[in-house]
Amino acid sequence: MTSVLAHRGPDDSGGFHSDIPGKSISFSPGNSFADFQPQSQAGAALGHRRLSIIDLGTGHQPLTNEDGTVWIVFNGEIYNYQELRKELIQQGHQFKTETDTEVIVHLYEEQGTACVERLRGMFAFAIWDERRQRLFIARDRLGQKPLFYRQEADRLSFASELKSLLQIPGADRTVDPHAIDLFLAYQYVPHPWSILKGYHKLPPAHRAVYENGQLQIERYWTPPYQHPETNSQFPFQSVDQWSAALRETLTESVRIRMRSDVPLGAFLSGGIDSTIIAGLMQGMSDRPVHTFSIGFPVKQFDERSYAREAAKMLGTDHHEYVVEPAALEMLPRLAWHYDEPFADSSAIPTMYLSQVTRQEVTVSLSGDGGDELFAGYDRYRAVALSQWFDRLPAFARKMMTASIWQKMPASVEQKSFRRRVKRFLAGLSVPPERRYLKWVGIFDTERRQEMYSPGFREQLTDFDADQFLLDAYQLCPDRDFVTRTTATDVQTYLPCDILTKVDIASMAHSLECRSPFLDHHVAELAAAMPLKYKMHKGRGKQILTDTFSDLLPESIQTRKKMGFGVPLNHWFRNELKPLLFDVLLDQRAIDRQIFDPQAVEQLISEHLNLQWDHSARLWSLLVLELWFQTFLDPATIPDHFPDPVLI
């Protein structure tokens, strides 16, 4: 179990076995214990692989308290550990290391499972309480660190990555058809599902106790999305007060994330979020901060000029790399590292960026979370515009949508724009909650049903993949629809897509990525903030731009959001074209009886003949089939993939 996770912790490994007979528990949230066999009759077996960041010499895990009755394995970072440590010492606790890990142990002794509510950081951890004979597991509030688990009759097994659990002898590898439907809808498998039956993800902001063969799971944190007028936590009355609070909170978040005993730097794309983080870091540093960006030969996917301009203004030590993405070489590596089908194609540049960054530093700060917390995506503008449409009389809406569509240019160059407008107009015909599904989904419900074979379609009877997103909308029913949409993304798209992408890509190269926007103090401030300060005249992240204008070049303040993408459309008509036929129409894929081969062939044909841009859909199908070939077809799973030579 440890060998498949060595990339997450190459510096050290260790394990703990309880010798108390009874239930058998195997797990590895930071990674697993190499010598543990699930047939053991131990009360608990804990294992860990370590990436050394704090207290490099004495941070060995599993780690215990003074008398060996509380043991922990921990993956992540606690940024307020120094303050908590001082408090615990005053209460009489004795420490033998300077690590944040040991702080959690003593905090648990003091406060039990409520300790998680005091932690400020990213984490997945497990604590074995010898006296109580119970296991306590928890995941951070926003889902920056992963935690998979499987409960059987006499055992709870869990790990940071699914592939670790599949190393247990006799591990079941039965695919969950509901998970496939969810994957095609969202391009990821959301929590609490996993791609395999019986395996689950602990959702963000949840903790669980396994005791006497029973697993009890509960949520421990919810962002304060109540209406601003009734929110006593943030009693601000003006934009200046909100702006001052934002500056103070985000600055503090950056400061505590710069605590490290190893070299650290920052990703710098040249966008608003990453530039703000790099600028705050530079303001706290007595030497130039290392910043990193990558570019591609295709101009529309290359942000290097903006990153270069930001680095020059901020005075950072900027590292710039140009890579030619080797998609054919990268695909099997993505399938292995991501454990489950994962079709966000920006995982490719994120992998490259993580690899080149790790050549210089061990820790990198990023701007992840800024878009979801402060309404930065274009789709939030679409939501706001749709609310305006909803206020029009029905006949006016019908006339206006027809007029817009008739005036749309029909050229091939405009097909992407036409597709977006068509999706927007189609969404206006359904209730607001389902409207968003039409805008963000890869395959909508009707298209998925067309793609499936009759036999597979029957396995999805009474299952509604849309419900995952619809449930998330209930978090703040009293707020405006744009705020409800951003809140939904914070619960769904952010942890399941963005943070999964970044965690896997960075840890694949033993790089720790820290995101100051994802400090729960920042998230709570953003949740309570009125929309009018985030979005002004259809422009998102307005308060970020205004508050940190001293760190942002004018060109970055006004630039259109680009995104971190790759030229899928081009690839599928060129170097990846043979792969569409060799993989998607291979006999192995057909024999799985998930898709109608004619529907797949039609999708390929429409794309290659320039009838429609199906690149995101084809990428999803390709990723899914390569996952099958990596994890289901072989008798054993390869324990590692070597890194490619990039530069």
Language model regions located:
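Globin-like tetrapyrrole-binding proteins
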Residues: 494
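Short amphipathic alpha-helical segments and their helix-coil junctions
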Residues: 87-92, 166-167, 465-480, 527, ...
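Glycine/proline-rich, flexible active-site/cofactor-binding loop segments
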Residues: 69, 453-487
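ATP-dependent adenylate-handling active sites, centered on carboxylate activation for C-N bond formation
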Residues: 24-25, 87-90, 110, 130-156, ...
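Structural motif
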Residues: 39-40, 91-99, 114, 173-177, ...
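Cysteine-centered catalytic environments shared across enzyme families
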Residues: 1-338, 350, 354, 549-550, ...
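PAPS-dependent sulfotransferase catalytic core
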Residues: 552-611
